[in-house]
Amino acid sequence: MTKIVIWAQSVCRSTMDLYREVKRLRDDVGVTVVLRRDGRGEDVRKLREAQGQGDYSDVVDRVWDGKFESGVELLDLGAVHVFSGYQVNHAVRELMVEAKRRALRVVEYDEAPCEMCVGVKGVLKRLYYAMILPMMVRRAVEAADLFISASGNMGMDRLVRLGWKREAIVPFGYTSGGFGEWGTGNGELEMGRGLRVLHTGVEAKYRGVDVLKRAAASLKRRGVELEVKFTGGKVDAAQLPRLYEWADVVVACGLCEPWGMRVNDVLLEGIPVVVSDGMGAAMLCDEFGCGCVVPKGDANALAAVLERCANDRGFLAHLRSGAKMAAAEIAPEKRAKVWLGKVLGE
């Protein structure tokens, strides 16, 4: 039996739903999930549980305090180790090096560097990514056999600048079980009403909400009928399926986001999306034809896509069909098979 150890950085549905399915997948593969519970990890756990994401106690097998000395003892649990958090955790980086010294297979499942800050903080963060982080992670990167990118196709050049070989980078993204019944979608666009456009989550600058507002204002000035709903912040998980059912299309126009879990949630409901190329989740639109990708920050391009959705019902029906197909393909059960195959080098 091949034994795999997954070093989980925090309790989050974006990874825990995947790990649960990986553990169930094959009789010839044994999986141990180790959860980091140092100070930061515990804070993240409490936040996730407050958001209704659960404690995933059925997924986690071991708890790790985030220290190198105690982590070394866990290296004996498997021949394949999937780490995460190498950018921010020194102990993880040292464990990657030690695992390679022991001739174990080392995989890093993580995001590409992505700068969501603005102003002076953003400038400093970019300098950190360019000048300091590459030196910090060099030995860990050299120790790894594979990098599975939770950012999909986004940020490949940034990963290469950190020292990753392009051929060792596998685009993947995140996955989740969603919140409602999969693939239900909205019905046909009703006569006598405009296009219903939904934007969920916080209205932070990095999410590009101003881009959608400018696009909507432009369309209304030109007489295009549409209704745009902004949730204006985080929404209780129980309310999300009803919101998705209301929408004809959901817009996620982030300027710089490593992935964007709301895109997964929307597609699992069978609702098409319009995603900016500043988000890793744009990969799903390219792969499944379940929506449109627009240049980040481009209100005119976003307006053009929404206008076509409003006026061309055949086009919108095509996107809906793609969304319903994607609902089955991006579910954790399906994605777990792909992920595990990459981890094992199959």
Residue positions per predicted region:
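Conserved acidic donor-binding segment of nucleotide-sugar-dependent glycosyltransferases
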Residues: 287-288, 292-299, 308-313
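Short hydrophobic beta-strand element within catalytic cores of glycosyltransferases
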Residues: 272-275
